[in-house]
Amino acid sequence: MKRVQHYLLDEQVPAPFYKRSQVADRCNGLLVEFREGFALEFRLYDDGMAYRFLSRTDDEVTLRGERAPFLFPEGSTAVVPYVRDTPQQHEGLPFGEQFMQSFENTYTETSLSAMDSTRLAFLPLLVRTPGGERVCITDADLESYPGMFLRRAAADRLEGVFAPCPRRIVAGGYDRMQGVVEEYEPYIARIAARQTLPWRAMALVRNDAELAQTDLVWRLASPCRLDDISWIEPGKAAWEWWNGWGLYGVDFEAGINQRTYEYYIDFAAANGLRYVVMDDGWSAGHHRPFETAGDIDLPALVAYGAERGVGLILWIGYLPFAGQMEELCAHYSKMGIRGFKVDFMDRDDQLLTDFVYEAARTAARYGLLLDLHGIYKPTGVQRTYPNVINFEGVHGLEQVKWSPVEVDQVTYDVTMPFIRMMAGPVDYTQGAMRNAVRENFRPVNGEPMSQGTRCRQLAQYVVFDAPLSMLCDAPSQYEREEECLRFIAGVPTVWDQTRVLEGEVGHCIVTARRSGEVWYVGGMTGWKARTVHLDLSFLPEGTYDVELFRDGANARRIARDYRREVLTLDASEGLDVELAPGGGFAARIVKH
């Protein structure tokens, strides 16, 4: 050991495009310098701790591995997002077949000692100790380094596992848009001179509600590297893929064509939506991204949208984008496109995390947003490059289109905000107007439905963090549901203040958020009906008008049943709201 340095941080940091406008960054820090050419840094916060290694050499270093053990008391339990089965095989490489996957799965609750030691878990992962502590483990500031998986190494111990650096990558997967690793190097990373490694971050709290409102990952991320962020506009988007371009009652054939996209633009403009996402199908082919399909005239659509205050975001596969990133960004930025939704990355090795930062930098130079799908969890790039506006890495609403009927999306909805969302925002793509109770749910790709009630879908716009948020259903569906549409379209996507009023992992969550002088509250339950007491004492003193959407009297049988009420209440009062099984509620609160 060469030197030990203690330090304190205590500052309020502006947080644009986030769940609060200011983040309190207060911690005790410890930096330990070693003679062997590296340092180890610790930070201790009120709601967590983190550590990271720092290279102190002036040379590149090859790392063959990293030890990251996490030891827990006997009797601890875990809420685990296992990787899904994958077809890749790599003889002699433990877990090699599990490194390529989409980071989308439901959670498995288990005792730590019974966790499947043959399967990796992706992060974040939650452990509960017998003493009542909650420990949520994730990465932060993951740049030019592989992401961490966890495996059970002993009855009471988890250990980090890291994908080796790819040696040979070939085009494969869906229409050859994915980079499939056929051969790995015998090391996990090449570290540049004086590079800082990612933080190993652990939220440490005593109740579930604190998990859903921690700022730990955002605090640990590198500060913004863009001089000008005034061009970055969060907001909502009309989106066609989930609903299958499902317009009806119109005088043209709906599909991937000019008339359909003009209709989506008109719908977005009429309802104050900032964007239309043009998903898979707009181009002449996945590997022909400079050409459009059918009669689509993209410059004309850009102009049509610009006249109405609506921007366009284009979907594109990972390899077609990575192979000609500069040319695509230059071409479509000049045309007036506002961003790309990049899909099918499905890895988090060093080369892929390098790609994410290169894409963020390149897109920012051309004034373009990025919405990353088929991607690992957020680790802070959204602070460093805030044009990276949202992430998938979530078992989102698209899953109900094809998952087995037994899939439990409702329980996932009240688990994910405490675990996955502690890492950052989620492009869950909510907003279904076809809703089903448990016994009526079926996966239907062409005309999909959600699990749970209509009000649950409304609540998700308040509960889920999403600076770019989709309206997943067809305009024709929303136009029949004017009250719900008006509420959804009006919910902000970034906030001045966020408070989780009530929460229990896997059972319920109630979140209050403020934008300016207006408050929104959203609540959801699992499959168990419950009564939520909405205590309004979080509001400043005074009288308030409350617009409330609550499950209807028959929502237990007919999930789309809801009631809208307008109430006048004092901040000293409370309100009991009954939630049906799989139910929810949403409220808008303004000063009377």
Model-predicted segments: where are they?
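N-terminal accessory beta-strand-rich subdomains and adjacent acidic, glycine-rich linkers
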Residues: 1-219
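Glycan-recognition and catalytic regions of carbohydrate-active enzymes
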Residues: 473-520, 524, 556-560
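Conserved, mostly hydrophobic/aromatic
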Residues: 53, 268, 343, 370, ...
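Carbohydrate-binding surface patches
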Residues: 504-541, 545, 585-586
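C-terminal beta-strand-rich structural cap/linker in extracellular carbohydrate-active enzymes
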Residues: 566-592
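An acidic-aromatic substrate-binding cleft motif
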Residues: 188, 192-267, 271
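Aromatic- and carboxylate-enriched substrate-binding clefts and catalytic-loop regions
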Residues: 278-453
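Acidic/polar loop patches that form or flank catalytic/metal-binding clefts of enzymes
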Residues: 369-374, 399-401, 467-478, 495-499, ...
